């Protein structure tokens, strides 16, 4: 699933935010903090709607500054292992009339019972990506016009 928006910032400014795992709590939904962050790997601590903390490990797969970054959710031996066999996120940035077109794509490969709930999986991914774009818009502002 993929969504996009245009923000009022240069691609380099957007890159500095999306490529720094420590900045995820400022714009990615449900992330309360990031632990053990390096440019190559990090752990998101997510808060469930019920207030329970869930840890999720990520690894940077590819990066082309300031154009594209991709990371993989390390689902094996995690709470997500029962519903996902793989999960990747890609963010691309393109200059656009004084701002930046930001496109976020998420690909989840469901496992187990989740294979039989494609609409729920897609709805969750849509909420996540839309929330991330809203977070970037809050940080940078939306490009008008």
Where are these regions (language model features)?
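Hydrophobic ligand-binding cavity/cleft-lining segments
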Residues: 1-39
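Hydrophobic residues on conserved beta-strands that form the core of alpha/beta folds
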Residues: 2, 102-103
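Hydrophobic-ligand binding "helix-grip"
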Residues: 25-26, 33-36, 51-101, 107-109, ...
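N-terminal glycine/threonine-rich, aromatic-flanked beta-hairpin/loop signature
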Residues: 40-44
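A conserved amphipathic terminal alpha-helix motif
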Residues: 101, 108-145
């Amino acid at each position: 699933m993929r969504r996009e928006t245009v923000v009022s910032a240069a691609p380099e400014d957007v890159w500095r935010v999306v490529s720094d795992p420590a900045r995820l709590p400022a714009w990615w939904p449900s992330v309360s903090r990031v632990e053990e962050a390096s440019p190559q790997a990090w752990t998101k601590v997510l808060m469930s709607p019920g207030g329970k903390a869930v840890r999720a490990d990520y690894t940077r797969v590819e990066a082309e500054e300031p154009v594209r970054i991709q990371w993989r959710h390390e689902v094996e031996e995690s709470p997500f292992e029962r519903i996902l066999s793989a999960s990747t996120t890609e963010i691309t940035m393109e200059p656009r009339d004084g701002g930046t077109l930001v496109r976020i794509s998420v690909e989840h490969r469901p496992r187990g019972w989740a294979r039989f709930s494609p609409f729920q999986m897609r709805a969750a991914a849509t909420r996540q990506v839309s929330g991330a774009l809203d977070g970037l818009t809050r940080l940078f502002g939306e490009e008008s016009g």
